């Protein structure tokens, strides 16, 4: 069939990645052991992460004729949308959307708003919740840590390259697998 349609593909090279360095493996193992311990003690894990959306079609490649382009036409979103998400082990999800770049101040604002929402939805939540965060600079910043401490919530950072243990990454992956604006509504200020 490939020959009939004049299709071809390129074999991808395997890249050497730091994900399997001894340090990364040990840190992931320690992180995994700590997570299992918290789950055994019925801690609620709240995965907080962020992404941004600058287009509505995330389909990157398509089959094409040998001399044709395999790229798809992108549908831009301008200005881009920043999304901060929190999802807990019970499946509750909280979103914040903005046009601002995510930084320590935006993370602090999100955490304050999140705890206000959780005060009404989950009384006594701070006794049982641990925030799981990746190692982004604004997650590690002193400002963010001070806010989390002031809110009385525990914090754990994931091990390096631990995407598969962060449920927010799966949520973002599901969002970014296809066309999120199938009706092609306007997505720019112009």
Over which residues does each language-model region extend?
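Conserved short alpha-helical interface segments
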Residues: 1-22, 44, 50-53
